[in-house]
């Protein structure tokens, strides 16, 4: 089975990208896939959310060519998810080695890369490795503008990864949130997927664990995974 590489990007802090990455990791692991979650963010948000040490030194050394062993740890046994911790040491990485070269030897069915919001070299690294790019943002102007810049960068990649915009923390009581998916689908000519606001998801992340298997957000994450499955082998125009 070919390994799927998914890049979860968000150019603005608070975009919901880390919750999306952790949620998809939990979904695929519960479905029986071997999951490798790569925290490429110097902030180490995903690493901290899972209760691991957010230094990032080992991953930074691997990307720089001075490390040899992939520094992954199993952060959950049920379902099992392997994590490559991120952290501040990644901030100094320049001219990094390709992700598929340094991580390709890890046995995984799905590799999820939680990208940094403001590090061009690391962001580009993830985009170049990805089969799928999910640009996370909230339904407001600044967040959407950041996601648009990321999606625009994928146009120069060959082959171009499959791309979708993922609106996070959607609240159907807000008129803008209800209207945004249709408006943005027309503007971007790309699929627009949604993750609804869900207290259970926020509580799980604050408690230092994987997102729950039930709830509104869990159903939305399942729909995102279904889109990824459905579009396998299809490109982005």
Please describe what each predicted stretch is.
Residues 2-42:
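Walker A/P-loop phosphate-binding motif and the immediately C-terminal alpha-helix
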Residues 30, 34-109, 204-207:
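P-loop/Walker-type NTP enzyme "switch/lid" segment
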Residues 37-40, 112-115, 167:
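Hydrophobic residues in beta-strands of the RecA-like P-loop NTPase core, especially within AAA+ ATPase
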Residues 93-94, 117-126, 144:
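Conserved ATPase-coupling elements of RecA-like P-loop NTPase cores
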Residues 122-141:
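Inter-motif core of Ras-like GTPase G domains
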Residues 132-135, 144-163:
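Anionic-ligand binding region
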Residues 169-174, 181-210:
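Beta-strand-loop-alpha "switch" segments that mediate conformational coupling across diverse proteins
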Residues 203-225:
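C-terminal boundary of histidine-terminating zinc-finger modules
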